[in-house]
Amino acid sequence: LVPATGFYEWRASKDGKTPFFIHPKDIELYSFAGIWSTWKNEDGQEIKTYSIMTTEPNSEMKAIHNRMPVILHPEDEASWIEPSNDNPESLEKLLFPLEDDSLEIYEVSRAVNNPINNDKYLILAA
């Protein structure tokens, strides 16, 4: 599980990329479906990595991007992390877009493009 309160996505246009902040309307803290791995590089150093699963966009996200992160419903979180679950089909059924009309999406400042910036104003509507 990758906890989140929102995420950014950029819509490409002739004027460049426009950043948007996106979050579920009715859930303050939620989880992305994540996968992780530990491996050793050629020097023998252990490397820990993770990734967020994506799926096709719902109707709201289609206007911005061709995919979206998998946002798990709270009741599905335990199934996603159950270590004894070795049935891929039961997990695949969780990899779907969030329901239409469930996201709040708004444009934010391009200041979010600079990794030096780290402030709550970055999630405010532009």
List the predicted regions and their residue ranges.
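Short linear sequence motif anchored by a di-proline
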Residues: 1-126
